[in-house]
Amino acid sequence: MGIEGVLKEGFVTTSVDTLINWSKTGSLWPMTFGLACCAVEMMHAGASRYDIDRFGMLFRPSPRQSDLMIVAGTLCNKMAPALRKVYDQMAEPRWVLSMGSCANGGGYYHYSYSVVRGCDRVVPVDVYVPGCPPTAEALLYGILQLQAKIRRENTIAR
């Protein structure tokens, strides 16, 4: 029995929810799952011009240390089980950002036999960033949209 069983929905729980969600938005640690050319723009977002660190984000190499997965690029059928495996290794709470036309719906390779038509068929996606490839500004906007979504979540009072 956790804190959600003790506290009923009210002022205290909503204040605690606000505090917890604020801390989650300020410390997203993304794991890069770069599969194609969109990964270059993802790296560009981490460089000095856009500096993704100012949002409290630090790219992590391990799924156990990250809470955000950025899927960037064409997802092939052979790579889909690896994507699911990495997603399952991430700790809760976890979020997925799909970056680019290929990750969103297959892109130019939509009709190919070897391409998964969207990574949302393998893992649940929270935010879609359109473009081919999307710019670093679009990725940052998608991250801001994800932070707004996290702020609206109910952590304790479900």
UniProtKB/Swiss-Prot annotation:
Membrane topology field: Peripheral membrane protein
Main location: membrane
Subcellular location: Cell inner membrane
Cell membrane is among the record's keywords: yes
GO cellular component: plasma membrane; respiratory chain complex I
Gene3D superfamilies according to UniProt: 3.40.50.12280
One GO MF term attached to the UniProt entry: iron ion binding
Organism superkingdom: Bacteria
Subunit structure: NDH-1 is composed of 14 different subunits. Subunits NuoB, C, D, E, F, and G constitute the peripheral sector of the complex.
Annotated family: Belongs to the complex I 20 kDa subunit family.
Protein's recorded name: NADH-quinone oxidoreductase subunit B
UniProt organism field: Leptothrix cholodnii (strain ATCC 51168 / LMG 8142 / SP-6) (Leptothrix discophora (strain SP-6))
Gene field: nuoB
